A protein has these predicted regions:
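Sec-dependent N-terminal signal peptides
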Residues: 4-13
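Extracellular, repeat-based ectodomains that mediate carbohydrate processing or recognition
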Residues: 16-311
Length: 311
């Protein structure tokens, strides 16, 4: 087997001054062909999931933590020969307490983009809680993916994903109905509860992102209007009620296809930050916008790229 190396660049910030930043490269050695990494920071520690494939194209989802300046022994969470393995739509995970929830994709039919989201819930020790269970229970042979997961402070997880169940139907003009984005909660026993559609028309293949503020879960994604404006939108749950989605900023980017470029959101108490790619007015840019009000509104975006950007 060929040996591949994944290099992880970690920013280590020392407390002496805010300017003392050292970038340290940490090598990660693992046999097989490895790809689709998902690196997560939780309570001061790092964890990583990735897909390995063997010479027969069997895929496995692996999990590892970085503790005490070294990687723990890898755990294989799931194995299959019927997976959808893709550079843009990849597995993700989150840690809540002593549990880790991971996602991966399985083909549901012969179509190129007919696949379902499967989940695996276990303790960090490796003890299985619920294995290989499906997230989207609609039963339609359509695209389901682009998953984001975050821990719920009350134990369990919040999860969001793109759901293509409606794309099998057609509009009056003959075009297929658009992709949707959905949300659910996963309990610490692996039950799927409080599932809801957040938006009935979103970009088909742009990554989603989710965070948890003191008010509740907040989701950002690339919207899709009837006029093919594909700007970044945000919606949040306050007092267990999801608010109407609003734009993070009105870029006005019109594009007649999916750019495969989703946003990223992070939060700290009432502060929320969203970054995203846009080509507003024909000028590629990576923007960053901040909210001091739990994501209810955002300030003007800050362009953070000096040169031309592609995503």
């Amino acid at each position: 087997m060929r040996r591949f190396v994944i290099i992880l660049s970690l920013l280590i910030i020392f407390s002496c001054t805010s300017k003392d930043i050292i970038i340290e490269e940490i090598s990660f050695l693992y046999d097989n062909s490895n790809a689709q990494p998902s690196l997560v920071s939780s309570n001061g520690s790092l964890s990583l999931t990735w897909i390995s494939t063997d010479k027969d194209m069997n895929a496995s989802l692996n999990f590892r933590q970085f503790e005490d300046e070294e990687w723990t022994n890898p755990q294989t969470l799931a194995i299959g020969s019927d997976w959808f393995v893709n550079w843009a739509d990849f597995p993700t995970h989150a840690i809540s307490g002593n549990q880790v929830l991971t996602s991966y994709l399985k083909k549901s039919a012969s179509g190129t983009y007919t696949y379902d989201v499967f989940l695996n819930l276990q303790k960090l020790s490796g003890e299985k809680i619920k294995e290989d269970f499906i997230l989207n229970t609609d039963g339609f042979k359509a695209e389901h993916g682009f998953v984001s997961i975050v821990a719920n402070n009350n134990e369990g997880f919040f999860i969001t994903w793109l759901d293509g169940r409606n794309t099998l139907d057609k509009e009056v003009d003959g075009d297929h109905k658009p992709m949707t984005i959905r949300f659910a909660e996963i309990t610490n026993a692996g039950d799927i509860i409080n599932e809801i559609e957040l938006d009935s028309s979103v970009c088909d293949c742009c990554q989603t992102s989710i965070t948890h503020t003191d008010k509740g879960p907040l989701v950002v994604y690339r919207d899709r209007s009837e006029k093919e404006v594909r700007d970044i939108y945000v919606t949040r749950s306050v007092d267990d009620v999801w608010e109407t989605p609003i734009p993070v900023h009105n870029d006005g980017w019109v594009i007649y296809g999916c750019p495969v470029n989703g946003p990223k959101v992070v939060s700290n108490s009432n502060d929320v930050a969203v970054s995203w790619f846009t080509v507003s007015e024909g000028k590629p840019a990576v923007n960053l916008a901040f909210s001091e009000f739990y994501g209810s509104s955002f300030g003007d975006p800050i362009k953070i790229n000096d040169h031309s950007a592609i995503g």
